[in-house]
Amino acid sequence: NVIMVSFASQKNGRDYELNFVPEFSKYGFTSTLFKSEMAQLQSEGKKVILSIGGATYPTMLDSLEEKEVFVSSIGDLLEEWSFDGIDIDLEGKSLKFNNFKIDSFGDHRLTFMIEGIKEIMADYYIKNGKKLLLTMAPETHYVQGGMSENLVPNKHGGAYLPMIEALKDSIDMLNVQLYNSGAMPGLDSNYYNQSTPDFILALTEAVIQGFTAANDLGTFSGLPASKVGVGLPSCKGWGYTEPKVLEATMKYLLGQGPQPGEYKL
């Protein structure tokens, strides 16, 4: 019931001003038809969310002025296209914060990003009288990677944690990308490989329970299970999990089946 539209792109080559310019002509679409189909989905109770970031469009706010442009440009897109929310999918260059901490941020660019998201949500509520949906789709490196002494802080491991912690009351769903990942630690300090029940269970439990991050990064308090999704690819690739394995894993995660691997909840 939630449709993600990817991605908002850079406007004028600036990484803090965003635009939405789909290549409609490639697919026989027009902006009018796109908006009409969005409206139809919304009339059926579905939500359509604009995804921001991705590997192709890094976003970094280096100054107060850039934050203001960022907030304004996204607000304009929400109004023009009638999206129900935003998905924060920052990757790579967008997360190269320096000397950050979970509770005190540290890097002014991280502070601007958190403040900017809060302002976007506040402005949307004032204009529309309802909450803007907020989801996030970080890579494992920037969440559970916060438990790795090797990744924190020299490789920006855990860089998403300050944002998740600061915005936890506003986040509607966190979908960590449990794919395209190297081995990652669980709460038991053991490392698990993707495409396995243990990987899915260990990394999902860490997000729900919270953890003390490595190298004095701070404490991540976790999110309610109702706000935690399991982000997996539906086609074969790096991190693909066979359907039968996934079904058994999810049943155990939900308390409806036996333990499918070595990791015990």
Predicted features along the sequence, with ranges:
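Chitinase-like catalytic core of GlcNAc-active glycosidases
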Residues: 1-207, 213-214, 221-247, 260
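Short glycine-rich, acidic/polar surface loops and turns
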Residues: 249-253
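C-terminal subregion of chymotrypsin/trypsin-like serine protease catalytic domains
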Residues: 259-265
